[in-house]
A protein has these predicted regions:
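Generic detector of contiguous secondary-structure segments
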Residues: 15, 19, 55, 206-208
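A short hydrophobic/aromatic micro-motif that marks alpha-helical segments and, especially, helix-coil
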Residues: 17, 86, 120, 227-228
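An acidic helix/loop motif centered on a single conserved Asp/Glu
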Residues: 23-162
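C-terminal/domain-edge helix-coil "capping" segments
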Residues: 22-26, 129, 133-228
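Positively charged n-region of N-terminal signal peptides that target proteins for export
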Residues: 1-4
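Bacterial N-terminal signal peptides
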Residues: 6-18
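Residue-level detector of alpha-helical transmembrane segments in integral membrane proteins
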Residues: 11-12, 25, 58, 207
Length: 228
């Protein structure tokens, strides 16, 4: 398995390096979140949050012009090819190797536990060059404040790796944005079904997310990607 992983990563590195070399900003890659044992919701909702929170955090980082953000699809393909991360579990060393392939300076490994609405998020920031865990971040709140927790850990991570903060106006817009957890759940389930190749179900769920939160730009972008 180890040699197969190294061989595939070497091939990917050859393909990825030209594009990465054109962008000198430090790269950051977010891996699927791990469900650490959650109760009070359907299993599918928790499965969906593993990719939903990954994408949400990726989107938050993408608002920062100082960062080059690795697309979730690249991480998904590499993990799938190696049969890794099926349960959301990837160790720091493996994450660092994949991070090097996609030109990331940092890799974000996250997990969550939802105990009947008491929601906790745990984040590890991995230095790709050394495979060391640079810093950990945590957030805990009610499940209904899930989106706010994601924006909070995004800001904490940015500070943790000494990156410039978002411009004040952009930061205020993100912090003041109130996305209902119901919309986040529909959005996450839509991503899950899109990953499974069920475009019709994904489209239905993106639309339901927009019905709950009409300003849900990310869900609208998801619909556009399905149509392309």
């Amino acid at each position: 398995m180890r040699w197969r992983l190294l061989g595939t990563l070497a091939l990917w590195a050859g393909l990825a390096m030209p594009a990465v070399a054109q962008d000198m900003r430090p790269g950051i890659a977010v891996f699927p979140f791990e469900n650490g044992g959650s109760y009070g919701q359907d299993k599918e909702n928790f499965d969906a949050l593993q990719v939903g929170m990954q994408q949400m955090l990726t989107t938050e980082f993408a608002q920062n012009p100082a960062l080059r953000v690795v697309d979730r699809s690249q991480i998904k393909q590499l993990l799938a090819e190696q049969d890794l991360g099926a349960a959301g579990r990837v160790d720091a060393n493996t994450a660092a190797r994949i991070g090097k392939v996609v030109g990331a300076k940092w890799v974000i490994l996250g997990g969550f536990v939802d105990f009947y609405g008491d929601f906790r998020v745990d984040i590890r920031i991995v230095n790709v060059e050394t495979s060391e865990i640079l810093k950990t971040e945590k957030a805990r709140d009610k499940r209904e404040n899930l989106y706010a927790m994601v924006t909070s850990v995004s800001t904490a991570i940015t500070r943790g790796v000494n990156l410039p903060a978002l411009p004040r106006q952009a930061m205020e817009m993100r912090e003041n944005r109130k996305v209902p957890t119901e919309a986040v759940t529909y959005y996450s389930r839509a991503l899950l079904y899109a990953d499974r190749g069920n475009k019709d179900k994904a489209k239905e769920l993106f639309n339901r997310a927009i019905e709950v939160f009409p300003e849900y730009t990310e869900a609208k972008e998801g619909l556009q990607q399905l149509a392309s």
